[in-house]
């Protein structure tokens, strides 16, 4: 459900079509990394794999990206993501990072500010303001799918 809500906000924010097929390879080609603070979960048990080591893995992954791509930025969906990003930013002493924060897109919090938050256009506006290349967020339709 959260990814569907991200897609809805994507469509509303950027006036894009509904990607329908879930192919995010264009985002990856544009340097976008989607990463949860915890990468696995038991079905119907949110947070069931928290504090099992995933947070440290995620922190180290973000550090690796920032050490090799210092202009990388963050779109944080929810407070756990924001806290984790802020921790890495402080540890690496990054000055003036691009940090876009929204409520989490889960069904429980989507109407508490996620819808209408425009994270994609805000992220690009910040990159453009800094003279950085913007992310090309367009996603393929079924007919354009090129994964295989």
Question: Could you describe each region identified by the protein language model?
Answer:
Residues 143-148:
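DEDD superfamily 3′-5′ metal-dependent exonuclease/proofreading module
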Residues 1-76, 81-101, 105-110, 114-142:
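A polyanion-binding, active-site-adjacent surface
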């Amino acid at each position: 459900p959260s990814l569907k809500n991200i897609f809805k906000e994507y469509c509303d924010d950027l006036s894009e079509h509904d990607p329908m097929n879930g192919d995010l390879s264009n985002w990856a080609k544009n340097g976008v990394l989607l990463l949860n603070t915890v990468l696995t979960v038991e079905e119907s048990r949110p947070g069931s794999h928290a504090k099992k080591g995933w947070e440290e893995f995620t922190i180290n992954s973000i550090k690796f990206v920032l050490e090799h791509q210092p202009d990388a930025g963050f779109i944080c969906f929810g407070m756990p993501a924001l806290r984790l990003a802020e921790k890495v930013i402080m540890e690496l002493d990054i000055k003036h990072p691009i940090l876009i924060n929204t409520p989490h897109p889960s069904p429980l919090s989507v109407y508490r500010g996620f819808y209408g938050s425009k994270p994609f256009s805000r992220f690009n506006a910040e990159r453009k303001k800094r003279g950085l290349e913007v992310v090309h967020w367009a996603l393929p339709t079924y007919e354009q799918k090129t994964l295989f």
